[in-house]
């Protein structure tokens, strides 16, 4: 269930507040952590795909070698 908030309600009381340097540093840290997490997830998927590809190549080569020997 989402709650819709109009701009007027959201900005009420925030007109005179500005982001401090610490706020920007925290935001930058959160963004970098998010991007790093996404790259790690992608890296795991690429590793899994690579290992599966190597496994099937080894399986195919051993099958071909087996039929060649028969």
From Swiss-Prot:
Membrane topology reported for the UniProt record: Single-pass membrane protein
GO cellular component terms listed in the entry, alphabetical order: membrane
Chief localization: membrane
Keywords in alphabetical order: Membrane, Plasmid, Transmembrane, Transmembrane helix
Transmembrane segments: 50-70
Record localization: Membrane
The family this protein is said to belong to: Belongs to the M.jannaschii MJ0023/MJ0349/MJ1072/MJ1074/MJ1107/MJECL16 family.
Name this protein carries in UniProt: Uncharacterized protein MJECL16
Organism: Methanocaldococcus jannaschii (strain ATCC 43067 / DSM 2661 / JAL-1 / JCM 10045 / NBRC 100440) (Methanococcus jannaschii)
């Amino acid at each position: 269930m989402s709650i819709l908030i109009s701009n007027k309600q959201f900005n009420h009381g925030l007109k005179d507040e500005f982001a401090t340097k610490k706020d920007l540093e925290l935001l930058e840290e959160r963004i970098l952590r998010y991007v790093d997490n996404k790259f790690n997830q992608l890296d795991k998927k690429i590793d899994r795909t690579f290992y599966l590809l190597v496994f099937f190549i080894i399986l195919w080569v051993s099958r071909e070698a087996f039929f060649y020997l028969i």
